Amino acid sequence: MLDYPYENEWNLGVDAAIGRRFGRHTLVFRAGFEGRWGGDRKGESVWAAPSDYYNRTYSGAFRYAYRARSVDMEFGLDYYRDDVAGRDAANYFIPYAHLRFDLGGGGFVPYVELDGTLKHNDMRELMETNLYYVPRYTDPMPRNTVDYSVRVGVSGRLVEDKLIYRLFVGYSFIENHNFWYCYTPTTRYEGFSLVQGRLNVMSLNGELEFRPVSNFTFSIGGRGLTYTEHQTLSIGLPEFEGTIRARYHHRKFSVGLVFDLQSNRYISRVIPWFPNDGIVGNMRIPYTVDLGLNVDWYASKRVTVFAEGHNLCNRRIYDWSAFPQYSACLLY
């Protein structure tokens, strides 16, 4: 085990919004600030550095919406000013447009969606994403990830709203995507780190939900993905994801079954400190099948007792290569 320093972090977020509705029109203005500060590192190791870090984001947004019987539309613009310690401040403008056209009484609704997000890459977020992350304290923290996305598709409700479907094609342009890599097991530095780069993602998505009776729901969904990366490292993402869900509701309890599938993934193995030049191969994360069960018992109007089961097929599941989950697990 590598004894590297631990990190403290605290955050502060403030949001405000003002809007007005007149007839079928709506105007909304939003402003916000989110800051994360860290430092006070403890311990001594080759990874340590004396500098603290901060991750501050200033945001603003404008929305105009118009809603009618067969047409819903919303337009706007999001602004982010990103300030990460050790990095030049960056400004991002993300357009926003959602258009929906009901051409068949809810049964056939074409739509177009254009939007985006900013995802923080502070210490807490990275450790929640990958528990085996070993930061290099001699480098600044990574930039925040910005995602510009567009989706074109159709949705609808059929058979007296018992059948709901959604089909769409999506395309995302991702700036500062985190390309994770793992260190070679032949070195004393085991764990994961990352480099950042651009990634383009195209996806074909389908979702179907069937409710034959009011207290039972069955749904199935899947998506195929293709990637255009601008890095020599493997992206560590699947080319197919699928989900099957079933849930039964009763006045006193509910039972849900979840079946998740994920295709093979590959993560690069590198020699420490040389993520682009020291690649020694790829680690394959095998096809994942995960069966889960969750039960809720409504003991009273205010008290619910729950139980959840995960990996009930008792397979070796890898969230990250070289670190598998073993056996089934239960949570009460």
Language-model regions, residue ranges each:
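Outer-membrane beta-barrel domain signature, especially the mid-to-C-terminal portions
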Residues: 124-143, 174-199, 225-243, 261-298, ...
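Repeated loop/turn-to-beta-strand initiation elements of outer-membrane beta-barrel proteins
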Residues: 22-29, 68-75, 106-110, 160-166, ...
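Residues on the lipid-exposed face of transmembrane beta-strands in outer-membrane beta-barrel proteins
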Residues: 14-20, 33, 60-66, 97-101, ...
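Outer-membrane beta-barrel transmembrane domain signature of Gram-negative proteins
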Residues: 2-69, 73
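Transmembrane beta-strands of outer-membrane beta-barrel pores
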Residues: 2-3, 22-24, 33-39, 66-70, ...
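Long alpha-helical, hydrophobic tracts
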Residues: 51-153, 163
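Membrane-embedded beta-barrel scaffold of Gram-negative outer-membrane proteins
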Residues: 106, 144-191
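Residues that define the transmembrane beta-barrel architecture of outer-membrane proteins
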Residues: 6-14, 52-58, 89-95, 144-150, ...
